[in-house]
Swiss-Prot record:
Part of the 50S ribosomal subunit; part of the 5S rRNA/L5/L18/L25 subcomplex. Contacts the 5S and 23S rRNAs. This is one of the proteins that bind and probably mediate the attachment of the 5S RNA into the large ribosomal subunit, where it forms part of the central protuberance. NCBIfam families: L18_bact. One of its GO terms (molecular function) is structural constituent of ribosome. Keywords: Ribonucleoprotein, Ribosomal protein, RNA-binding, rRNA-binding. This is Large ribosomal subunit protein uL18. The lineage of its organism: Bacteria, Pseudomonadati, Pseudomonadota, Alphaproteobacteria, Hyphomicrobiales. One of its GO terms (biological process) is translation. One of its GO terms (cellular component) is cytosolic large ribosomal subunit. InterPro entries: Ribosomal_uL18_bac-type (IPR004389), Ribosomal_uL18_bac/euk (IPR005484).
């Protein structure tokens, strides 16, 4: 029987394998969630470069947020990431949720990024 860590890695690989087949050259919006913070970045896999990133660890966000571990914080990060991605010239992405289910903070970040102008 696989350990929890192995199962999460297997699920993340399965999601990313599917994304590669549907990406068609679009950058990937990768999301990572920890118990205290949330991180997101837009990655160009062809060039191997990060085009835009945002997280609850940034100094300007840390002062304004009550905590980095709620849906309100994820919403702020999603809007900030969409703003930075549009400045970098990115409007279309594929959403890489990794091993996380599309619910709660992950869903809040995705919806805020859509409101900010990203399409996926």
């Amino acid at each position: 029987m696989a350990s929890r860590k192995e199962a999460l890695a297997r699920r993340a690989n399965r999601v990313r394998r599917h994304l590669k087949s549907v990406a068609n050259g679009r950058p990937r919006l990768s999301v990572h969630r920890s118990s205290k913070n949330i991180y997101a970045q837009v990655i160009d896999d062809v060039a191997g470069k990060t085009l835009a990133s945002a997280s609850t660890l940034e100094k300007d966000l840390r002062g304004s947020l009550k905590t980095g571990a709620d849906t309100a914080a994820a919403t702020v990060v999603g809007k900030l990431l969409a703003e930075r991605a549009s400045k970098a010239g990115v409007t279309e992405v594929v959403f890489d949720r990794g091993a996380f289910i599309y619910h709660g903070r992950i869903k809040a970040l995705a919806e805020a990024a859509r409101e900010g102008g990203l399409t996926f």
